[in-house]
Amino acid sequence: MQIMDYQFPYCSYPYNFSDKIKFCIGKIVCKTFDVIGIKIYSKITGIYLEPEKISSYNLSDTNHQISNEKNLIYSNIKWLIVGITIIPTIYYGTKLQYIPESKLWYIGTPLVFMNLFNTLSHICQYIQLKLHTDKLKHNIEITNSLENPICILDSIDYDSIISTRKLIWSTTKVNHNYVVYNAFYSDLFFVFDREKMLNDFILEKLSKLSENDIDCLANDPSRNRLVQQMQDEFIRNKLYLLLMQCYRHQYTNSS
């Protein structure tokens, strides 16, 4: 799977301090190599990789290319050591007149410089690829950090949450009135001037409503009229019971 070079404005690479240090050092080293002609040499020898080509690599391609660059660096270092070893040998050979002095430049020196420039070219490519790898890994971390909350959200049973909230009634005080409102349908509410009346209404009426009853009440075009009717009926019944209790109390006392 190819990892696209996504840009995250709030956390683009390099993001943290260590990434910035690594990024700056890598860029400074590569720029120094360019100044001494490594870039031109690598283009002539075909070692150079265009930045656009490196940017098109996914993580797997980049790791494979990094492995190749490592092998080429080790190989050129070995030949560089061989060249460095040959030069003193030829030098002492010329002193002892076993080898003509001109052979020093024809055999040892070109071998040293060629492998030195090859090594530096591959090191520059290695640094560029490592920076690209760090950028890809950073983008993958950001992508995963975005995907994890999404997976959590997808696993939530919203229907159950909604059903639960529809059966919850909350209360608040507005000026001198007491208000009870539905936790899901916030525009479904009842207003009372006495707190005890409100609490009794919740206990005796609202707590006994089913989810379907609440849906029907909230979505009914004449909801306001039904709400007022429901509240008036409750108050009327309460007053009737209160009068009956008073009447019973008087009747008992008079007896």
Swiss-Prot record:
Coiled coil: none annotated. Keywords: Glycoprotein, Membrane, Transmembrane, Transmembrane helix. It is found in: Membrane. One of its GO terms (cellular component) is membrane. Glycans are attached at residues 16, 58. The chain crosses the membrane at residues 72-92, 104-124. It is a multi-pass membrane protein. It comes from the Viruses. This is Uncharacterized protein R342. It comes from Acanthamoeba polyphaga mimivirus (APMV).
